[in-house]
Amino acid sequence: KNDLVELIDIVLSDLEKNKFISDKYYSESKAKNLIQRGSSINKIRNYLLSKGVQSKYIKETIDKIKENNDDQDFFSAVKLCKKKRIGPSRTDENRPLFYKKDIGILARNGFSFETSQRIMDLSKDDYNKIISLL
């Protein structure tokens, strides 16, 4: 049994040394994947924490995201609205009816109240322009 544990430790240390296992690379690639799916920075942070990634790597990853795009949460929220067909993607007559529900959906996905309000206040034309850029 001890031989097996030693063998596992040797294999793991070899994989870490050759960078096949790395919290840094995992956090960067997973964050990139989650951003493409429209996740907020808070949701990404909580996901990485739940996976046991070290805080320093999470901080580096979040800083890199903010460095690349200062308002990443806004664009991620726009992607989420498109994906779930909420907020500005609703028809104009339905938007006031679903305002609170849509704010709640955005909040549960980790977006701040200010970001959620900015999204909900977008006109249909502005929303479509932003979507065409993404």
Describe each model-derived feature in a short phrase.
Residues K1-L134:
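An alpha-helical, amphipathic repeat domain used for nucleic-acid recognition
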